[in-house]
Design a protein with these regions (language model features):
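Core SAM-dependent methyltransferase catalytic element
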Residues: 203, 219-232
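SAM-dependent methyltransferase
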Residues: 107, 130-194
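A short glycine-rich, Lys/Arg-flanked "PGG" loop and its adjoining helix->strand segment in the class I
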Residues: 110-122
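A short acidic, Gly/Pro-enriched loop at the edge of an enzyme's catalytic core
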Residues: 85-94
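Class I SAM-dependent methyltransferase SAM/SAH-binding core
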Residues: 46-85
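Conserved class I S-adenosyl-L-methionine
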Residues: 1-33, 35-44
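Conserved beta-strand signature within the Rossmann-like core of class I S-adenosyl-L-methionine
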Residues: 123-130
Length: 232
């Protein structure tokens, strides 16, 4: 999966407002419930970790993308490029923000939720968001091109049979004036509220709340935020 290529183009995608809005929602829950000792799964370039650090929360971030973790470490954030199954510490809250669960194939999702359960203390929270069907069909699909500095970026996203394939192409101008080309794809899957509810309950979580959230549009909720608690 093209997560490392996505890490290269992410700074040019102009998602700052959406990042701020969604992170504010997660941080509000952390602060209101006085949560501490938090693991951020799929932490990306560490934007949410920075919020936790500013608010003097104990935190740890993990991501499978080495490129993303390099950015975190350049910011002196506590983050590692390791798989969830390799985490040995226990936490009082786990977050997975900005479609992390949509990147996980259906057949692997139950294992991911079980692994999340294993890194949490009893009574700990698991908070995550997923794209709604409206979010995939009406928001995520489409094409964009970005021409900036010495780079040209093309992104083409198509949603079909409950899967969103995003093709990313990056052209970068070299010192000799020629352009290099990198291409890769990212696959995301739609997970229904009913499917996620079933897996969570089977994996020892109680669902406290499922919130509809309008991130990109005022028309319909393009995201669902799950607030869960470990009970087994």
């Amino acid at each position: 999966m093209g997560l490392d290529l996505y890490a290269k183009v992410e700074p040019y995608l102009d998602f700052e407002e959406e990042v701020y809005t969604l992170h504010k929602e997660f941080l509000r829950f952390v602060m209101v419930n006085e949560l501490d000792n938090i693991i951020d799964i799929g932490c990306g370039q560490g934007y949410f970790l920075e919020n936790l650090m500013v608010n003097k929360k104990r935190y740890f971030g993990i991501d499978l993308s080495v490129e993303q973790i390099k950015v975190c470490q350049a910011k002196n954030l506590n983050a590692k490029a390791i798989a969830l199954k390799d985490v040995t510490e226990k936490f009082d809250c786990a977050t997975a923000i900005f479609d992390v669960l949509n990147y996980i194939p259906k057949k692997e999702l139950k294992q991911f939720i079980k692994e999340t359960n294993l890194v949490l203390n009893q009574g700990a929270y698991f908070i995550f968001d997923v794209n709604s069907l409206f979010g995939f069909e009406e928001v995520a699909q489409g094409c964009i091109t970005i021409d900036v500095d010495d780079k040209f970026i093309a992104i083409d996203a198509n949603f079909e049979k409950n899967k969103l394939q995003t093709d990313i192409t990056l052209f970068e101008k070299q010192e000799n004036g020629m352009f290099s080309k990198e291409s890769d794809s990212i696959i995301q899957e739609y997970h229904s509220k009913e499917f996620l509810t079933k897996l969570l309950k089977e994996s020892g979580f109680e669902i406290v709340e499922i919130k509809e959230f309008n991130l990109h549009t005022d028309d319909n909720a393009d995201k669902l935020i799950f607030i869960c608690k470990k009970i087994a």
